Amino acid sequence: MANDENKQKALAAALGQIEKQFGKGSIMRLGENRSMDVETISTGSLSLDIALGAGGLPMGRIVEIYGPESSGKTTLTLQVIASAQREGKTCAFIDAEHALDPVYAKKLGVDIDNLLCSQPDTGEQALEICDALSRSGAVDVIVVDSVAALTPKAEIEGEIGDSHMGLAARMMSQAMRKLAGNLKNSNTLLIFINQIRMKIGVMFGNPETTTGGNALKFYASVRLDIRRTGSVKNGDEVVGSETRVKVVKNKIAAPFKQAEFQILYGEGINTFGELVDLGVKHKMVEKAGAWYSYNGDKIGQGKANATIYLKEHPEVSAELDKKLRELLLNNTGGFSSAVSDYVADYEDNGEEVKNEEF
């Protein structure tokens, strides 16, 4: 018993010395602090928020979003920025690809007048800007588009054709070590968009890999694989794309879930269409024949008209969104039993889907 008391005294003294040297909060018991509650920002897609398990992307963490060209990577990050700005948060966009379209961003709901934007010359400059913004504590969301475009200074100053083996990977590895702690301290969300490359000579398994080495894969709390699976048509006109997002890695909830939603050209994620689908799935929206009803009132004939009704009545869509989140997400940020009915398991049959109605 005396030995236990001596141990507790020694532990208390050690904790006191650590806090005195490194500051209060430098060491703590896991259950005593806000570390139990992860603050999140909505992705703009209700089904993806559900698949992530905590209601969105976690603050203070690194997130990687990767996929083929024209799969919706930049659109998804702009929707995250729009969601954050609606909550009064400050956002920054590091446009290493020099391809950000402010007109399109504005259509997605981004307040471009208050969006910080940088088009860096080198990869080192881009990552230094990220580090400076995160250390300031004044920026809540930083998006880097993309890792593949973060070109090391030595490569830019060299000749085309020169070999620069592993330069980008070393640059990213050093940056991750430096950024991870600063992001946690300032509670800043850092999203990296990444591209896909093919590994040569792979006979078995997936030949796809992402650029920038392995460091980002380890440091990322969430990794999302986004793919276009088909077309959304209005008659013969293609008005959008069916999109599937797989949660390949998740440190805040159960991984290997996936979400499917529509991205409409010029509008972004079809949030109201998701509300109709999820509402019907969980019996909050009644469907009788082609008619959709909510709280006993008819809201439209056909999914397209029901979607338009929710778009024109924001108070109704906000109420339905709140009810669905309360049902599908529990307080601990994990999965409720209802979620498994909607969020599909991690699989990919590779079939293209044609959806005539949106």
Curated annotation (Swiss-Prot):
NCBIfam families hit by this protein: tigrfam_recA (TIGR02012)
Annotated binding of ATP, by residue: 67-74
PANTHER family membership: MITOCHONDRIAL DNA REPAIR PROTEIN RECA HOMOLOG-RELATED, RECA
Protein's recorded name: Protein RecA
Major site of localization recorded for this protein: cytoplasm
Protein location: Cytoplasm
Gene Ontology annotations of biological process type: DNA recombination; DNA repair; SOS response
InterPro entries per record: AAA+_ATPase (IPR003593), DNA_recomb/repair_RecA (IPR013765), DNA_recomb/repair_RecA_CS (IPR020584), P-loop_NTPase (IPR027417), RecA-like_C (IPR049261), RecA-like_N (IPR049428), RecA_ATP-bd (IPR020588), RecA_C_sf (IPR023400)
Lineage per the UniProt record: Bacteria, Pseudomonadati, Pseudomonadota, Gammaproteobacteria, Enterobacterales
Gene Ontology molecular function: any one: ATP-dependent DNA damage sensor activity
